Amino acid sequence: PDFEEVLHNVKVLDIKQNQKKLRMGQLKGNKFKIHIKNTNNPVEDKDIAEDVLESLKVTGVPNFYGFQRFGEVRSTTHLVGKCLVEGDIKKAVDTYIGNPNKNEHNQPFEARQLYDEGKLQESYDLMPKSMRYEKSMLKELILSKEKHGEITEKDYIRAIESLPKPLKRMFVNAYESYLFNKVVNERSKIGINKYLPGDIIINEEERWVHEIDEDTIEDDMNKFTLNPTGPLYGSKVPYAEGKQGEIEKRIIEEENITKESFKCPKTPKLGSHGIRRSLRFKIEDTSVTKTCDGIDVEFFIPRGCYATAVLREIMKKNI
């Protein structure tokens, strides 16, 4: 079949047979070509972007999670996750179903507003089909209220459990990502491209390196064969030592939670052990081209990394 006629804005470069089928996560990375329009001065901005990309090739790109991790219209996914970690299930449900955002269309906005006012059936009736997950949760609450005359914590838990497993898992994962971004931001102030004693280091296969060779660590860091990590917080994730470890501990303390909180005792299936994630990623095959109204930026980055992290470094130069 002609895939390009079926898949719009997709270009098929090559098709090959393989003895093993492809699985999620097996890609090496992604190549991007992004147009930044309405820049101040395309000629100067091209030079600025090239300088930024050359610098990032040396230091690595801060491994921030992109805004899409938290919800593009309503950035609430991580807030729901925080409520689950804190054990406030009612607040988690209220945050997901209610809490309207001014960027939403009128119908979803009004439906969420009705929920916040306690008008559950009216809210349900007004919700469009696109809000199927909110409707699924709300249906549980309405049935419970009709049956028992009130909504208990168990009912709110059932409302959460009515969601598909990937979505349920996303809440706490998004909160972990939010906290990780805080770690990256703080660690960037003291350097993400150098080894600090006490760092927990991973190699290119994302495996922990338990023995650090002081004679070669700087060269390994420069080659990106080794990278420092930060915590995706969880009940079993270890902290680094030294100043960077103090940063990691302070960030979670400021949230008024502990590692144990990530066991999510009221919704244990949604708990997380946590892992360590690289604080930076390698960027390759970069180029910048001037256009009539801006610049085109091209680059290749590993899987699991966000192009928005690269754009963040370019755009903060006020191009």
Language-model region placement:
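Extended, charged/glycine-rich binding lobes that contact polyanionic ligands
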Residues: 1-294, 298, 302, 312, ...
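ATP-binding Walker
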Residues: 305
